Structure formats: structure tokens, C-alpha cells
Amino acid sequence: MNSLAIIGGGSWGTALAIILAPRFPRVRLWVYEADLAERMRETRENDVYLPGCRLPRHVEVVNQLPAALDGAEIVLSAIPSHLVRGLYQQMLPFLNQSMVFVSATKGLENGTLLRMSEVIRDVLRNRLAPRVAVISGPTFALEVARFEPTALVVASTDATLAEILQGAFSGPTFRLYANSDPIGVEIGGSVKNVVAIGAGVVHGLGLGHNAMAALITRGLAEITRLAVAMGGAAQTLAGLAGLGDLVLTCCGDLSRNRMVGVELAHGRKLEEIVSSMKMVAEGVKTTNAVSDLARRHSVELPIAEQMLQMLQFGISPREAIQRLMDRSLKGESG
């Protein structure tokens, strides 16, 4: 495979263009904002979302979808979850059966509760029989763009496709593991953002390392329960797309979702926090969908439920933590 189209000019899309450019002779990066696209062409830098990281010379920055998709063999989307359906609908006239579609978005669609790979299939199914994969794992865009060692997962129900993409994407500092469980991978990448808000609360309230360890461990138990109920494999959540991503997002200072929790613990209002952010904290948007999925599959997710109560119904961060501590006692597997 020689031609790659990356849809999304945020920090993650830009980082993917930088890290994957050595692997593909032709790379096009679609950027929504025309003025930003023009500056990126001139300066070879995304000064809004990933300043200080230079785009390789042969990465072509475009602002029009037809130009981005023309001749592409792989379409890799790295856009906020709430934009995926609409953008794929816009792209539909320019797509063809030979293309492979890869989602790098971590989130769920509110209302339908679909995972991102399911949204892509839903849009394309009447016209194409799409080959779809997902990439996910513990990845901060800045570290990827700096060529710091990173490992993640590429998952598809088509094991051969996952292995092809593993070979196409892997490089000296970007190691991919093939996986045949997109359900587990996508649920891990989505629900960890909700748990990370709780981790931010723990940090922001100064509750200590014991509390953080408990939050991460019980959060992983919740993610695993939901993924298994939906048909995913428990072992997936013990890997990069589960435990790995959860630890990074809960503990790393670059985590936007963790930052939301920290700021809430410091007394700021959610609306103020979100409006001040350049990039989306997916956990804020995902919390409702996770709660709805839990009810649909009769799975108990107490941490996710308290994050919903805090984000949507206004209970205080300290009360959310205390409610978790006051729950009825049970076995660890419960």
C-alpha cells in the first residue's frame, strides 16, 4: 500500500501524518480549517494543535475532501466522535470498494451507542462492503510526533487485514500488535476516557496514591465487564487497548480527560472547562453513551455512573468519590 489519506488535522491526525509518512510514498492530510491548512502548507507545522512538530515535506495538506481521497488506498480518520457520521457521509461520493478504512477515534456515538467502526460501516454499507479496522492504545500525540517509542493495537474482524495494516504502519518507534477483537479494543479506548475524569478528580482533590490505584483497578474491571457483555474478549482489556490506555490516560499530564477531572475538583464549572479547551475531551461526550450501554447490557458501572452524576446532574466531585466508597460491600469479582 502506497497512498494514505488522513482525515483530521487535530493533534492526533497530525501526529499520525508525521509518524506514518516514512512508510508511505504519498500522504495527504485533510484539515477542516482552511486558514490552518494554508499555514501548515507554508510552515510545515500545526501551530494550533501540535506546535513544534514538523510535517515531513512530502505530506500534502489539503482542505478539500475530494483532493484528500483521490487515489487513496487507506483512509485513516482521526476526528472527534460526534463528527464521524457526518464526515463519512460527506466523503461517501469519493470512496470506492478498493479502499481500506481505519478509525483512530476513541468514542461512542450518542443516541445510537455505536462504536466508531460501526458508525463507519453504517454509513458505507448501502454503497460499499467496507473493510474496516481500528487503531487504539496508550498514545499521546505529542510523544508519537516526537518519535518516542509507542506501542498500540490494530484490530479488525478480518485478521488478515489487521496483519496487513500492522506491517504497513509499524516503524522503528511505532509498534503495532494485530488483534481480532475490535469490540474490546474500541470499548477500552472509549470507556477509559470516562474513568480518566475520575482519576483527575482523585488527583485534583489530593486523595493520594491509594485512591488512584483503586480507581484505575476498579475502572478496568468496569471496562472489562462492559466489553465482555458486548461480545469482546477479557484478555483484550488486559492489553494495550485496555490497561495500557487506561493507565496512560489516568496518570499522564497530557491527558485532556484527566485535566477535566482535575479542574472540576478545583471548583471550575464544566462549561467553562470545555469552552477553554482547544481539543475535545471525549470522556465528557462519552459518559452518557456509556451509561446507556450499561443499562442496555445490564452491567453495573459505578464509577461511570458517578461521573455521569457529576457531569450531568451537578453532584460535587468529593460527593462522587464518597458515593463510591459508601457502596454496599461485595466480592472483588462483583
Report residues per predicted region:
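Rossmann-like NAD(P)(H) cofactor-binding subdomain of soluble oxidoreductases
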Residues: L55-D70, I74-F147, L165
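N-terminal loops that bind phosphate or other acidic moieties
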Residues: L76, V144-R146, G198, A211, ...
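NAD(P)-dependent Rossmann-like dehydrogenase/reductase catalytic/cofactor-binding core
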Residues: A199-H203, V228-A238, L246-G334
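Internal alpha-helical scaffold of NAD(P)-dependent oxidoreductase catalytic cores
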Residues: L83, F94, V119, V123-R131, ...
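NAD(P)+-binding Rossmann beta1-loop-alpha1 motif at the extreme N-terminus of oxidoreductases
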Residues: M1-C53, H58-N63, Q90
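Conserved active-site and cofactor/substrate-binding residues in soluble primary-metabolism enzymes
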Residues: I7, S11, A15, D35, ...
